[in-house]
C-alpha cells in the first residue's frame, strides 16, 4: 500500500497555480509556495488508504471498475495498469453516452467483432480492395475508441478517473447513473462530483502512474480474495450472421461515424 515517501517522490503534493483553483478544494490544501498550491499529504495518505480498501472490496465482490483517462500523460499508464488487473479502460477519447447509452456502444463493439470474424473466416478476401480497406479503417477506429471496453458486457459498477475536469462528461454520466467515482483531485477539481476523492496531482506522469498502480494493486488484491469462490462466466457469444457482415460493410463504405467527441 502507498506510503508518504511514495507520495513525496512522485510529486503528488504539487497542485496547480493559485489562480487556477477550485475553492471547494481548500480543505485539502496545506499552503502555497511560489504561486503553486501544496496539497496536504497527510490527508492524501488517509484518503488514499481508505479508497484503496473500497476498491479492493469492490473487486472482491466481483464488481467491474472502469479506468478512464484520455490525456497524453495518462493514457499509457492507465492502459497498462487496467490490463494488469483485467479491468476495462478508455484512454483514447470518451464517446458521449458510453455509459448512459451503453446499448448503442455495445452495437458498435459488435461491429468490431463482425469485422474480425470476416478476417478470420476469409470472407474479407472476397471483397474489392476498396471495400476491404474501408473495413480495415473502421476496425482500427473501433479498436482505438472501444478496444479497452470490448469485453465489458454491462455498465461498470465503479469508475476510476484521471483528471475529472477533462473527463467531465464521463463523471457526469457516472453521477447521473449513480455509479461511484474514484479519482485523484488536483486543486482545480470539484470534490462534490467524486464519491471517493484522493487529493493529489493528476498531471505529473509519476503521480498518475502511482494512482493507476495502486488502484490496480487494490483490484488484484480483491480478486485474490475472491478466487476461492469465483466461477467463470458462461461464454454467451452470439454467432455472427451474413446479414450483420453486409450491414457493417455498407456502413463502412458510407464512412458513417459514431458517438460524439468530448471537448
Swiss-Prot record:
It comes from the Bacteria. GO terms for biological process: translation. PROSITE patterns: RIBOSOMAL_S2_1 (PS00962), RIBOSOMAL_S2_2 (PS00963). InterPro entries: Ribosomal_uS2 (IPR001865), Ribosomal_uS2_bac/mit/plastid (IPR005706), Ribosomal_uS2_CS (IPR018130), Ribosomal_uS2_flav_dom_sf (IPR023591). It holds the Pfam family Ribosomal_S2. The keyword Transmembrane helix does not apply. Residues 223-249 have a biased composition (Basic and acidic residues). One of its GO terms (cellular component) is cytosolic small ribosomal subunit. One of its GO terms (molecular function) is structural constituent of ribosome. Keywords: Ribonucleoprotein, Ribosomal protein. Residues 250-263 have a biased composition (Acidic residues). Residues 222-263 are annotated as: Disordered. Belongs to the universal ribosomal protein uS2 family. This is Small ribosomal subunit protein uS2. The lineage of its organism: Bacteria, Pseudomonadati, Campylobacterota, Epsilonproteobacteria, Campylobacterales. The gene is rpsB.
Amino acid at each position: 500500500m502507498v506510503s508518504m515517501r511514495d507520495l513525496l517522490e512522485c510529486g503528488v503534493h504539487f497542485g496547480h497555480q493559485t489562480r487556477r483553483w477550485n475553492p471547494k478544494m481548500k480543505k485539502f490544501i496545506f499552503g502555497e509556495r511560489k504561486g503553486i498550491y501544496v496539497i496536504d499529504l497527510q490527508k492524501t495518505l488517509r484518503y488514499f488508504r481508505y479508497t484503496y480498501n473500497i476498491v479492493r472490496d469492490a473487486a472482491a465482490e466481483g464488481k467491474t471498475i472502469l479506468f478512464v483517462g484520455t490525456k497524453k500523460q495518462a493514457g499509457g499508464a492507465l492502459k497498462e495498469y487496467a490490463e494488469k488487473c483485467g479491468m476495462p479502460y478508455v484512454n483514447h477519447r470518451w464517446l458521449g453516452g458510453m455509459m448512459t447509452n451503453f446499448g448503442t456502444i455495445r452495437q458498435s463493439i459488435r461491429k468490431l467483432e463482425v469485422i474480425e470474424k470476416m478476417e478470420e473466416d476469409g470472407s474479407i478476401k472476397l471483397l474489392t480492395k476498396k471495400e476491404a480497406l474501408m473495413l480495415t479503417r473502421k476496425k482500427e477506429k473501433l479498436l482505438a475508441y472501444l478496444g479497452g471496453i470490448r469485453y465489458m458486457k454491462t455498465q461498470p459498477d465503479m469508475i476510476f478517473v484521471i483528471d475529472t475536469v477533462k473527463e467531465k462528461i464521463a463523471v457526469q454520466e457516472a453521477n447521473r447513473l449513480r455509479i461511484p467515482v474514484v479519482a485523484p483531485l488536483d486543486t482545480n477539481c470539484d470534490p462534490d462530483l467524486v464519491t471517493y476523492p484522493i487529493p493529489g496531482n493528476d498531471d505529473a506522469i509519476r503521480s498518475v502512474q502511482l494512482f493507476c498502480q495502486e488502484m490496480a494493486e487494490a483490484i488484484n488484491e480483491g480478486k485474490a480474495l475472491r478466487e476461492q469462490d469465483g466461477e467463470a462466466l458462461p461464454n454467451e457469444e452470439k454467432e455472427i450472421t451474413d446479414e450483420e457482415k453486409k450491414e457493417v460493410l455498407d456502413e463502412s463504405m458510407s464512412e458513417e461515424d459514431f458517438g460524439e467527441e468530448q471537448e
